[in-house]
Design a protein with these regions (language model features):
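Short coil/turn linking the two alpha-helices of tandem helical-hairpin repeats
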Residues: 33-34, 49, 71, 84-87
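Solenoid-like repeat scaffolds
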Residues: 24-34, 61-70, 97-108, 144-146
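"A position-specific structural signal for the A-helix of alpha-solenoid helical repeats
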Residues: 4-5, 41-45, 49, 75-84, ...
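Long, K/E/R/D-enriched contiguous segments that form extended
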Residues: 1-30
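Generic helix N-cap/helix-start motif at coil->alpha-helix transitions
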Residues: 1-4, 32-42, 69-74
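C-terminal non-catalytic interaction modules
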Residues: 89-171
Length: 171
């Protein structure tokens, strides 16, 4: 949806006031069946990009997954939040359900399925790298992020935090 795209791009550009105006100002224009869930998801995104991870998670947990595209977006966001909050056990549960969803869903294209599986693999390896400090996971991650991945910039930031890549290595 256009609402989601505008908010996501605004947040990626750190235009928080603009995003908040869109989130609240255009809620009434959303389709009534999706309005509340899209608004909750938008609030979760806003809080995630603002660094309010607990609040972001709270919004995510209130979303009812009745919209196909939202399921993928929400699970990805929840995985990133779990990483930020160092909640590996919760992340493992989400990873398991996300894998089943991707594997069993025939609506997703092969390319989209591959992209989402790669994202899950990256998140899994990020947790392993942070927990173990084993740089071999980092080198595997560097190879994986060369591909088309959702939230690639966020992943690169996490690799920077873990000292796997240097600023000049980012594309």
């Amino acid at each position: 949806e256009f609402y989601r795209t505008i908010i996501l791009q605004s947040l990626k550009l750190k235009k928080f006031d603009y995003a908040l105006n869109i989130i609240n100002g255009y809620k009434k224009d959303l389709h009534p069946e999706r309005r509340e869930n899209m608004h909750l998801y938008a609030c979760a995104l806003y809080n995630f990009y603002s660094g309010n991870f607990e609040e972001a998670l709270s919004h995510c947990q209130r979303v009812k997954l009745n919209h196909f595209a939202l399921k993928i977006d929400l699970k990805s966001l929840m995985l990133m939040i779990c990483y930020e909050l160092d909640q590996e056990i919760s992340a493992n549960s989400i990873i398991d359900s996300f894998r089943h969803f991707i594997t069993n869903n025939r609506i997703l294209s092969v390319a989209e399925r591959r992209k989402q599986k790669s994202f899950i693999e990256v998140i899994t390896k990020l947790f392993m790298l942070r927990r173990s400090g084993n740089l071999s996971y980092g080198y595997e991650l560097k190879k994986l992020i060369a591909n088309d991945l959702p939230y690639k910039k966020w992943i690169e930031e996490k690799l920077l935090d873990l000292k796997v890549i240097k600023r000049k290595d980012r594309k």
